[in-house]
């Protein structure tokens, strides 16, 4: 396993449509391993193959419930809407509010080539949509409603910490 270089906004590969994976071989499994290591090293919750320079429909996600590896992911169902703050490892220092579905169902293959179905709500729904967008050359900044500056981000983090403390006491 190896940490790969994360491509940043302005790199043309981030704007290209990724190709479907036809065969899950050792190269794809190594890619999955490297992507997970890269995502964790960068403190991310998701990473798509184009972000490490590979135009294949492969993503890894971990929103705190364990690593998810998705090959050829496709959103097959979505409902509701939510607005949340997003950032991106390929666009460091930038955050903004983005409207996404509140719930999505994604079909994909796992590393063994088995079909899997993932239902995502809240943060997982956001992460699934965000990473699948990468596979189509779409960045979150294309969908941003409003950019958030660092001061506002810090205020929101502090409010979340306070709310967690209140919940734990109550």
Swiss-Prot record:
Gene that produces this protein: def
Molecular-function annotations in GO: metal ion binding; peptide deformylase activity
Protein name per UniProt: Peptide deformylase
Reactions this protein catalyses: N-terminal N-formyl-L-methionyl-[peptide] + H2O = N-terminal L-methionyl-[peptide] + formate
Domain of life: Bacteria
SUPFAM superfamilies: Peptide deformylase
Transmembrane regions listed in the UniProt entry: none
Cofactor mode of binding and number, as noted: Binds 1 Fe(2+) ion.
Biological processes per GO annotation: co-translational protein modification; translation
Residues annotated as catalytic: 131
Cofactors, names only: Fe(2+)
Source lineage: Bacteria, Bacillati, Bacillota, Clostridia, Eubacteriales
Source organism of the structure: Acetivibrio thermocellus (strain ATCC 27405 / DSM 1237 / JCM 9322 / NBRC 103400 / NCIMB 10682 / NRRL B-4536 / VPI 7372)
UniProt enzyme class: hydrolase
Function, as annotated: Removes the formyl group from the N-terminal Met of newly synthesized proteins. Requires at least a dipeptide for an efficient rate of reaction. N-terminal L-methionine is a prerequisite for activity but the enzyme has broad specificity at other positions.
């Amino acid at each position: 396993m190896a940490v790969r270089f994360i491509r940043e906004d302005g790199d043309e590969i981030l704007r290209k449509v990724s190709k479907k994976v036809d065969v899950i071989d050792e190269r794809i499994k190594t890619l999955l391993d490297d992507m997970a290591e890269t995502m964790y090293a960068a403190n991310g919750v998701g990473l798509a193959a184009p972000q490490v320079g590979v135009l294949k429909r492969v993503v890894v996600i971990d929103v705190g419930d364990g690593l998810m590896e998705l090959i050829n992911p496709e959103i097959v169902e979505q409902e509701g809407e939510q607005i949340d703050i997003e950032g991106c490892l390929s666009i460091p220092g930038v955050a903004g509010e983005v409207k996404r579905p509140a719930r999505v169902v994604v079909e994909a293959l796992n590393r063994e080539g088995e079909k899997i179905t993932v239902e995502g709500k809240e943060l997982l729904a956001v992460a699934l949509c965000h990473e699948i967008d990468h596979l189509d050359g779409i960045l979150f900044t294309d969908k941003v409603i409003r950019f958030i500056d660092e001061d506002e981000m810090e205020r929101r983090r502090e409010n979340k910490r306070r709310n967690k403390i209140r919940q734990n006491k109550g």
